[in-house]
Amino acid sequence: NPDILCLQETKVSNNDFPLKAFEDLGYEVKFSGQKSYNGVAIISKLAIEDFKVDFLGELKENIVSKEYLKQKRIISAFINGVRIINVYVPNGSSLNSEKYEYKLKWLEYLSKYINKQKERNELTCILGDFNIAPTHLDIYDPKKYENGIMASVPEREALKKILKNEFIDAFRVFEKGSGFWSWWDYRKNSYELNRGWRIDLIYISKNLLPNLKSSVIANDERANEQPSDHAPIIINLNFDEKYEEYDSDDDDLFAI
């Protein structure tokens, strides 16, 4: 029962998004999708303001190649005083593929996007499926997978460039060690054997850190019948008296 729900890889066109199902539960919904591939959505009990779609939400058209606007992978909105940026980063396939080069260029555009957004000095939350394990601690078998796809030096350096020591991995505020995964391959009984990666991430701006109360991976959801191969990541933020217009069952807490 989150206050804000962010989805990635919705795989439906805008016309086919199950809008009514969420509206019947009291949510406002914004999304950007395409048939069979990609797609992102922000679903909120709180009012969604200043909704932006694609890289053109922050960047001028002459900066972004049209090739990087076709895939629906990024949206943002201003909700309850926080800028929510929801991303579905390309997987990259393999290090010698064109998809890998596409991924690195996409991350370069994301860096420019975040730099532009930061000019407004908003409380900010960047989240989604990053398809990058930030460190060796985020892979069940780093000796096997380090320097491969989702764990290569260029990918990690691109992620660091985006964050620039100005954003904090919310989960790592509470859990420092290894053994915490958000994604398990459908193949080879990966979930049953707990062979996972932590590639679904929530980053918060430093000015939002005092409001962060918890961050968990709901990995039990992966055990459901016909589950996603990803588990939900949840954070709770507390704004005390700051946003008195928001009235919820949890007082001043809201969950993403």
Predicted segments, located by residue:
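Surface polyanion/phosphate-binding segment centered on an Asp-His-Pro turn
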Residues: 216-256
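Structured beta-strand-rich core segments of catalytic domains in phosphoester-bond hydrolases
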Residues: 9-13, 17-94
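Active-site beta-strand/loop signature of hydrolases that rely on acidic residues for catalysis
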Residues: 1-15, 84, 113-136, 170, ...
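Acidic carboxylate-rich catalytic motifs and surrounding loops in phosphoryl-/glycosyl-chemistry enzymes
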Residues: 55-56, 169-178, 215-219
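Conserved beta strand-loop-helix elements of the APE1-like EEP
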Residues: 36-51, 190-211, 237
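Metal-dependent phosphoesterases centered on the DNase I-like endonuclease/exonuclease/phosphatase
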Residues: 25, 106-199, 247-256
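Active-site-proximal loop/helix segment associated with metal-binding centers of metalloenzymes
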Residues: 83-100, 142-155
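Short catalytic/ligand-binding loop motif for oxyanion handling, primarily in non-cytosolic enzymes
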Residues: 14-16, 39-40, 93-96, 133-143, ...
